[in-house]
Amino acid sequence: NGGGNYTEKNMTLAIDGSLKRLQTDYIDLYQLHWPERNTNYFGKRNYNHDIKEKKWNDYESVLKALKKFVDQGKIRYVGVSNETPWGLSKFLEISQALKLPRIVSVQNPYNLLNRAYDIGMSEISCRENVGLLAYSPLAIGYLSGKYRNNQIPKKSRIGMFGDFWTRYKEDNAKKAVDDYYNLAKENGLTLTQMSLSFVNSRPFMTSNIIGATTMEQLKEDIGSVEVELSDEIIEKINLIHANNP
């Protein structure tokens, strides 16, 4: 967790600690939370290569350590999070060559305002059968509509913790939210329902990681699984996205 040292010793401490806290014998899916190398994750749009950076090439040792945990029965499957096409490809390449545990999932952000996953990761997901566990499907609440017209509810995440997700405050993002809101309303849907249903419809999607602070929000989120977007709505969503990248 936290892009820390993925040594066998550190991962052993982390896994044993998790097993103890969870009071369970094994973990179904164990994911590496952050890439240990320098890369463009968590809101960074571009990769800035640092020639002075110490080269990180411990894929083999990390996978070998994970294999020990699988063999010991502590974990069953392994995944990554906040990964890039290059990083995921390296893990897959080395695991196949050395017959080590294969990455089965990647937990990255994905929503109507952040479709970076579509560019390179989606093809790898589909062709290599690595499912996306999409986090922030409502863009930290922007796609619920509660921040429209510069409103900031006191008990919202931004109201309590401030807003450092600058990409969602840009003018084109605000316009996109308004356009998505109107499209949902025209089709008898809430913005939340349409946003989550779109995420659910993607061919590379394995799990849509929703978040809710009230029972009403939870019911609306869960209800999105009953919503099936028409081809026409999908086409209009893609048009809004093209006009507000």
Q: Which residue stretches match the model-derived regions?
A:
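Active-site mouth loops of central-metabolism enzymes
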Residues: N1-N10, D50-N57
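Glycine-/small-residue-rich active-site loops that bind phosphorylated ligands and cofactors
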Residues: G3, L19, L113
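Short, acidic/polar
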Residues: T7-R21, L63, L88-E93
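Short amphipathic alpha-helices and their capping/turn segments at secondary-structure boundaries
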Residues: M11-D28, G120-N129, I233
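Beta/alpha (TIM)-barrel catalytic core signal, keyed to glycine-rich beta->alpha loops juxtaposed to Asp/Glu
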Residues: P35-L239, N244
